Amino acid sequence: MTMIGWLQIILFCVIIVALTKPLGWYMTRVFNGERTFLSPVLRPIEAGIYWISGVDERREQHWLTYTVAMLLFHVGGFLVIYGVMRLQAVLPFNPAGQSAVAQDLSFNTAISFITNTNWQNYGGESTLSYLVQMLGLTHQNFLSAATGIALAMALIRGFSRASVRTVGNFWVDVTRCTLYVLLPICVVYTLFLVWQGIPQTLGDYVEATTLEGAKQTIAVGPVASQVAIKMLGTNGGGFFNANAAHPFENPTALSNFVQMLSIFALGAALTNVFGRMVGNQRQGWAILAVMGVLFVAGVAVTYWAEANGTSTMHALGLTGGNMEGKEVRFGLVASSLFAVITTAASCGAVNAMHDSFTALGGMIPLINMQLGEIIVGGVGAGLYGMLLFVVLAIFVAGLMVGRTPEYVGKKIEAREVKMAMLAILVLPLMYLGWTAVGVVYPAAVASMANAGPHGFTEVLYAFTSATGNNGSAFAGLTGNTLFYNLTLASAMFVGRFFMIVPAMAIAGSLAAKKSIPPSAGTFPTTGGLFVGLVVGVILIIGGLTFFPALALGPIVEHLAMNAGQVF
């Protein structure tokens, strides 16, 4: 651990906080239908989309109608991705002559990208054509990100509105998010990435001759445009198998830093949107503070663990920390910071091999996902996930003082608490249940490259990542099998939609309630006490739910390595 390393972490946090308010102001205007500096150009396009699709932008939807529209939208996205992957061999823009993708892998990938998970049981450069990367994956990266933000806006409206039955219009929210937020930023972002050295071409793969005289094929393609939205939209799926560790996806320290910023930018800004729409920006800052406390703690532990190395390394006289699986152009701090960011934000992109982290260093990304990736989280998903924990925290506070719980003027009653618990309990049910199957079912055990606690952690990480819609992996596990393609797809599906539906039910319930003015007995929700309460609820629920599994995996691995046993 060095002063330069800590300065990088501090600089990252300062820039994210600085971006939160202006981005939040802009996004609030966009979703309220107010004029922005892009309106002269984009408003005619927006109106044209509504006219062609037959959408009345002034007609809002009940929460159930909003949810059904979202589900139908995902069905369409699934069919597009699955179709282009199965027909890849006969479609254009396939310079490498890639064949059709197998049914189970196509199914897994389609579910993966519509759920914003981007779990990849394939290597992009050796499996997919340019058309599939663009029309199937990059296209869906925009739509899944826009969907997440739209759902967050619906829940925010549930808190901010009173005595109404509507939470917005799904089609309008997705259109505005894509046109006014994602596309403009990604255009500029793509140009920056091209300047940094990332390819953006539809030309053939490059044939090169090495210094030894051997022939080598260098994969290129429309990479920069996909990287821009995969980071900004917290999708995470790489154009190349090595993801952000590949020099054609993340060539420089500057591109790496900007990519980390882009992962957090919109998620952090949504906390400010929440504060603005409920009429008190301090509410948004309090939520961001909860996220910040958990994030800084995770970064500190991961950086310390990786910089300290392992007892095995110390016994061999090795110093300099654990550099296994890390790119020297990034080093320890940027690799550790990236790992915590990508798992806190449900992004899943990686610039280092998480499987090669120390036991404790790899445990923090795992915990981030097990908590539901609420530390900023995926665009939209992080905020509505955090608000579920806020509902529980407010309920606990109400029990302690003997009053009906209230939050931003809305009573938190049995229906909201039940829905919040349903959404939160679905996650451990899926990844703990499937992990139990994965470590005893013979076809699943055959995919494990390591035995002992590390092998167990690989399986636990895979199902946690899939259920949490993250997509990163402990890559020692062979995932492209029938068992894992189907089970991981089921985990991704349940983790996405069985959390969304309860959250939308809460939105509808709250929107229909009257707004209650604060009184002397109202629990304050903008100060340190509230922040501490929410952090405590998150850690208690996480500790009770996940500690036994963590004890069987990374914790026992760490203790065993200190005793001289490796896996």
UniProtKB/Swiss-Prot annotation:
Family per record: Belongs to the KdpA family.
Membrane topology classification: Multi-pass membrane protein
GO cellular component: plasma membrane
Database matches in HAMAP family: KdpA
Gene: kdpA
Membrane-spanning ranges: 3-23, 64-84, 136-156, 179-199, 220-240, 254-274, 285-305, 330-350, 374-394, 420-440, 488-508, 527-547
GO BP term (any one): potassium ion transmembrane transport
Compartment(s): Cell inner membrane
Keyword Cell membrane: yes
Gene Ontology MF terms: P-type potassium transmembrane transporter activity; potassium ion binding
Coiled-coil stretches noted in the UniProt entry, renumbered to this chain: none
Source domain of life: Bacteria
Oligomeric form and interacting partners: The system is composed of three essential subunits: KdpA, KdpB and KdpC.
Protein task: Part of the high-affinity ATP-driven potassium transport (or Kdp) system, which catalyzes the hydrolysis of ATP coupled with the electrogenic transport of potassium into the cytoplasm. This subunit binds the periplasmic potassium ions and delivers the ions to the membrane domain of KdpB through an intramembrane tunnel.
Keywords associated with the record: Cell inner membrane, Cell membrane, Ion transport, Membrane, Potassium, Potassium transport, Transmembrane, Transmembrane helix, Transport
Name of protein: Potassium-transporting ATPase potassium-binding subunit
